[in-house]
Amino acid sequence: MMIEGLEKMLAKGVDNALLRFGLGKGYLDAGDAERAAEHLQRCVEQDPKYSAGWKLLGKARQAAGDLAGARQAWEQGLATAATHGDKQAEKEMTVFLRKLDRART
């Protein structure tokens, strides 16, 4: 239901980082990681300082099997979070990256 309303807003020409984040989260929660990643990519293109967008983009890419893409998103998000003092997002993405590293060995 939430996705439907957000898609209607997008179709009417409303497009911003928060809307794209909502769509990305909705699609990820619904199990459509690839579509989620598309919206989250647009989210961080529109607001590169949005560390939560980078964090969720990494999760969506990971869920879609794109581990290199997940790493890239989390590394970018980590730099963004550190620059803007978003300590919680910084901690979470550091943990996600460590888990990716452990999975490779």
From Swiss-Prot:
A family per Pfam? TPR_19
Coiled-coil parts of chain: none
Highest taxon above the source species: Bacteria
Repeat recorded as keyword: yes
What InterPro entries does the entry give?
TPR-like_helical_dom_sf (IPR011990), TPR_rpt (IPR019734)
- Sorted UniProt keywords: Repeat, TPR repeat
* Entry annotated with the keyword Ligase: no
Q: Where are the TPR-type repeats located?
A: 17-50, 52-84
- Tell me what this protein is called: TPR repeat-containing protein PA0015
